[in-house]
From Swiss-Prot:
The gene is ndx-1. This is Putative nudix hydrolase 1. Keywords: Hydrolase, Magnesium, Manganese, Metal-binding. InterPro entries: Nudix_hydrolase, NUDIX_hydrolase-like_dom_sf, NUDIX_hydrolase_CS, NUDIX_hydrolase_dom, NUDT18_NUDIX. PROSITE patterns: NUDIX (PS51462), NUDIX_BOX (PS00893). Residues 72-201 form the Nudix hydrolase domain. Probably mediates the hydrolysis of some nucleoside diphosphate derivatives. It is an enzyme of class 3 (hydrolase). PANTHER family: 8-OXO-DGDP PHOSPHATASE NUDT18, MUTT/NUDIX HYDROLASE. Mg(2+) binds at residues 124, 128. Belongs to the Nudix hydrolase family. Its EC number is 3.6.1.-.
């Protein structure tokens, strides 16, 4: 059946260039196809201004609202190191919760409505360890389902004293040698954070250049759940970098002017994060996951769970997706996108797409 004759009541509609594009208001049906939406224009409407967010290109459901502790939870965690080499230690807290009382874990806790994610990690470190800290960089984002997100930060101690008196937040805090953690010499609540410790060691050793903006959550309210795909292809010799963008992005100079240059999807809580990635890969490129690795890192996050009464506690995440070097450049399924070359080293670094550049890791649980 031709695309233009699909029944919008019973089917999700995949609009391509040349067809009328439905408004980005809600999902039209119960199928599993991706709905491709407006790209800056409506019939008779004026093109969007630069630096304004686009209406998302694709849609998989829609959140009526996003509110912390109602339908979404954010967790803030800290990795804090001291010493070097074989003497490197990590700061852990002894859990006070009944389910894991007495076991050791990284400082972490739920973000409360009315505070930023950065404020939350500073508060948790103070309550659980006794130390004041400076939040240096986002190390990792972990996502479970579509309503649970854990932000792990690299932090530095700025003051305070090691906690020794137990309370409801923690029983104590202590420094442990990383080698002892890996050798199972410490009774841990869980071992999932050890890879974050490794990432922190790598970050401290090969941290970002000072002139490059840190990847920290931007304090902007987001009315929904959004995912941006920065699909990057590096040549085998590392001399050429290409990225998939909207056709309105004529060349790399436009990247710096556009708020949202990459393919973007809005999704609802009924779609798990990994499922959204899989569906969008298949929709964007002929070979999908056969030619592009699973998103491995994040390069931008917008999230602001305040004020408390807001219904826009959602999140917008830009993910780094690396095209396989062994594969030919993927055929684009939608005519609204194209590949552009990014030749400027400064632009590559600004967008965190340079090959050896630090990027916070992404783990889909």
């Amino acid at each position: 059946m031709p695309l233009g004759k699909l029944d919008l009541v019973e089917e999700e509609y995949i609009a391509e260039s040349g067809d009328h594009t439905p408004e980005a208001s809600r999902l039209m049906g119960n199928g599993d196809s991706v709905v491709e939406n407006l790209n800056g224009h409506t019939n008779g409407a004026v093109a969007k201004k630069k630096n304004e967010p686009r209406v998302p290109d694709m849609q998989l459901g829609k959140c009526r609202y996003v509110r912390l502790h109602d339908n979404v939870n954010y967790v803030a965690a800290a990795i804090i190191l001291r010493n070097q080499g074989d003497d490197t230690e990590v700061l852990l807290i002894q859990e006070a919760k009944k389910s894991c009382r007495g076991k050791w874990y990284m400082p972490a806790g739920r973000v409360e409505a009315g505070e930023t994610i950065e404020e939350a990690v500073v508060r948790e470190v103070k309550e659980e360890t006794g130390y004041s800290c400076d939040v240096v960089e986002l190390l990792s984002l972990q996502v479970q389902g579509s309503g649970w997100y854990r932000y792990a930060f690299y932090c530095n101690i700025t003051g305070g004293d090691l906690k020794t008196e137990p309370d409801q937040e923690s029983l104590a805090a202590e420094w442990y040698n990383i080698k002892d953690l890996k050798a199972n010499k410490v009774q841990l609540r869980g071992r999932d954070f050890i890879r974050l410790v490794d990432e922190a060691v790598t970050y401290r050793t090969h941290g970002p250049v000072d002139s490059i903006p840190r990847v920290m959550p931007l304090n902007q309210n987001v009315a929904g759940l959004f995912l941006e795909f920065m699909i990057v292809k590096h040549s085998r010799d590392g001399l050429r970098t290409e990225v998939l963008v909207h056709k309105s992005i004529k060349d790399e100079t436009y990247l710096l002017e556009e708020e949202q240059p990459f393919p973007t999807v809005e999704f609802g809580f009924e779609y798990f994060f990994a499922m959204v990635v899989s569906k969008c890969y298949r929709h964007l490129l002929e070979e999908g996951a056969n030619v592009v690795f699973t998103p491995s890192h994040v390069t931008r996050i917008k999230c602001h769970p305040k004020p408390m009464e807001s219904l826009a506690h959602g999140v917008s995440i830009r993910v780094y997706c690396e095209h396989k070097q062994s594969a030919s450049k993927a055929i684009i399924r939608s005519p609204r996108y194209h590949w552009i070359s990014v030749e400027s080293p400064e632009t590559r670094q600004r967008f965190h797409m340079a090959q050896k550049q630090f990027r916070p890791s992404l783990h889909m649980l």
